[in-house]
Amino acid sequence: MECIFCKIVAGQIPAKKVKEDEHMLAFHDIDPKAPTHILLIPKRHLASLAEAGSRDHALLGHLLVKAAEVAREQGLDRGYRVVISTGPDGGQTVDHLHVHVMGGRPMHWPPG
């Protein structure tokens, strides 16, 4: 197993977890880009959004619902940003789908 996020799911690498269920794990990003920066990952390896198919509909919806729950639990009442980076040009740096929840400061547009 070479995927760092799969190793986190397996408990081989520690993470500061904030939420977990049978389908996903949420934890603090080790290189935060906002005062609150949480990653949500599916427990099943899925390389990116580009590789998602019809069998992933429920999982993707679940991740978004859990992202909103995490934002509420983290006190992001004034707003937050949800990001899924896909592929090298999209800024994806880990080949395991992950949802960023960022907040705690004004999030400007365009992002960069």
Whereabouts are the PLM-identified features?
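HIT superfamily nucleotide-processing domains
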Residues: 1-112
